[in-house]
Amino acid sequence: VTDLRARRHRETRAEIVAAGLRLFDEHGYDAVTMEQIAAAAGVSRRTLYRHFPAKDRILLDLPLEWMAMWDDVVAAAPADLPPRDVVERAARVIGAHLDAEAGRIGIAWRIIDSVPALEPAFLANPTWTERVVAVMEDPARGAPLDRRIAVIVAGAYLGALDAAMLAWAAGAGGDTVADTIELIIERLAPIWP
């Protein structure tokens, strides 16, 4: 019963996110109401608000997926894998996912780019920075990096990724997210200590 309940919870969230993205894309983020999203998703307002207390939380569901992927890759990485390899592996996994979900990811990034108030929640934020820094400071992965250096490296990666994703969503970012991630990995390799 618990597995069924958890699966239904995930399915409902996915239906709400899909409906929200579709409406945001068709009508603009600011023009869409929570009531319209509930109707388009085929759920009650109560169900919608139980899953997402505000409109921006529907968009925030996407980076939360990516954070969960990041956490899974980091947890599955051998303890002695160097931090750079762990960070690059996680970035590649997320990039492949973003390419597989290019339609909805592109819509989300275009919305983020068109609504400046949403950008701080999505772009290189402290939560992402701390996840990357934690990998670099992990003593099991070798000598931990000085925190200042770890924050600088994390900021460089995340800033480059944010800029690349905004360009990609606008149609100027190249072929795939995976290609862009490879370019970032290649160009930023010299900053690793």
Enumerate the language-model features and the residues they cover.
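Short hydrophobic/aromatic patch on the recognition helix
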Residues: 43-52
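Secondary-structure edge/capping motif, primarily at the C-terminal ends of alpha-helices
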Residues: 109, 140, 164-172
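Amphipathic alpha-helical segments enriched in hydrophobic/aromatic and basic residues
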Residues: 24, 33-34, 55-66, 84-87
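C-terminal peripheral helix-coil segments that are non-catalytic and often amphipathic
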Residues: 133-138, 170-193
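Basic, helix-initiating cap at the start of DNA-binding domains
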Residues: 1-43, 60
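Hydrophobic alpha-helical connector segments
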Residues: 68-108
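Hydrophobic alpha-helical segments that form the core
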Residues: 112, 145-167, 179-188
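Amphipathic alpha-helical packing segments from all-alpha helical-bundle domains
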Residues: 116-141, 148-155, 163
